[in-house]
Amino acid sequence: RWESPLVTLNCAALSPSLIEAELFGHERGAFTGAAAGRVGRFEAADGGTLLLDEIGLIPLEAQEKILRAVEYGSFERVGSSQPQQVDVRIVGATNADLPGLVREGRFKADLLDRLAFEVVRVPPLRERAGDILLLAQHFASRMATELGRDEPPTFSREATRSLHRYAWPGNVRELKNVVERAVYRCDSPVIRELLV
């Protein structure tokens, strides 16, 4: 599948009412505003991989449809009864405790069983202190390039201490945002202060 499509969907960026249409597509007139039919992420990923970021936020109704698509390799677009055949590998990413969501009735146990073939647990950033400065330097370099700067800024000792003292509850995304803001605001080659 490495030569096949990799399609992503950030489930946190969509309202629950839009997730099903994004995943499975829709027919013209399926709902208000559906002026034309649209291919969903499952069809776009046919033969390849579909990455569902923040999979724990998907509503139960859409989870049921995902389960059927995984088990049977087919689904219907929103507003259609015509089955669409797909061969898609699903990768889910989440900060949520999916077994806990299953116990609370907010995630389907059988979908978790189907998706949990191989689970990779990435510890929170606060448990990977050695990664913090490396990631911060990477994000600073990328942001400097985006801003058209010749050299990426470095971090002062105090800024480095701040990076390591902070618990990073938002993990890598929060670190990236903090560093990008610091680079944007910094007009010298050294970042001296971080807003954390």
Predicted regions and their residues:
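Conserved post-Walker A coupling segment in P-loop NTPases
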Residues: 1-32, 43-59, 124-130, 178, ...
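Structural recognition of the conserved hydrophobic beta-strand(s) that form the central parallel beta-sheet
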Residues: 8, 51-52, 68, 88-94
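Substrate-gripping "pore-loop 1 plus following alpha2 helix"
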Residues: 33-38, 63-84, 93
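Nucleotide-binding/hydrolysis machinery
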Residues: 1-4, 79-89, 96-196
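Loop/turn-to-beta-strand initiation segments
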Residues: 46-49, 65, 86-91, 108
